């Protein structure tokens, strides 16, 4: 299995201020391309804006604003094809946490399936949580006893707020969602089906021009480009783990023409769908 490849190992002493600090924030504004790696510690990753390809335990995720990941020390991940990507990594060492809280539930570990550790945040949740993350960013750079406790208390607040505001990437649209959140949810639900932006805006009485502009500002991509990237990431997953024909994979990912799908896939990843699948057949 290709999963035997571990990549770089990021060491605790390179990221934590002292051996007393349980929590740190690694700001990535922007997040550059970063090779396959794993850590001595766990992390909560929150994406604020821009876009990129997050390869997490060999599964591709096209990430943008609102994506949130609970990454464990045993996971391997990397960042590729980034464009104005901004995120924060909230790093924590479980055995240093001292507050009496249900940390295992609030900050799920690698014992849970990966699908249960990827969530999305809407605008309200992002705004609320970012205020706490900014405070933690300042507090975690101190090592006195009071600051250590405050840092851990801020981590607890962030974990609680994340649990309150998060929703599954494929959940139905929320009734009180902002326009941008509703659009993101609709796109995630349209990987296999056609999506008509103008009809979506008309249905919800949105201004197509302003929503299109705001989407580009926040994600760094146009609406069609983002949807195509979602579909290509799904195609990578299907090619890796399932045995459907290339034509079936294309159809499941919203491409009516399998030849066109192959061209687009090759343009995006530099390899044909069949050659990409063969990589994993060769190492099983």
Curated annotation (Swiss-Prot):
GO molecular function: DNA-binding transcription factor activity; sequence-specific DNA binding
Subunit structure: Binds DNA as a dimer.
Role this protein plays: Activates expression of the rhaSR operon in response to L-rhamnose.
Keyword Lipid biosynthesis annotated: no
Record site feature (Interaction with sigma-70), residues: 248
A GO CC term attached to the entry: cytoplasm
Protein name per its UniProtKB record: HTH-type transcriptional activator RhaR
Chief place of localization: cytoplasm
Compartment(s): Cytoplasm
Feature: DNA-binding region: 198-219, 246-269
Signal peptide: none
Domain HTH araC/xylS-type: 181-279
Coiled-coil residue spans: none
Entries under PROSITE patterns matching the protein: HTH_ARAC_FAMILY_2 (PS01124)
SMART domains in the record: HTH_ARAC (SM00342)
Domain of life: Bacteria
Keywords: Activator, Cytoplasm, DNA-binding, Repeat, Rhamnose metabolism, Transcription, Transcription regulation
GO biological process, any: positive regulation of DNA-templated transcription
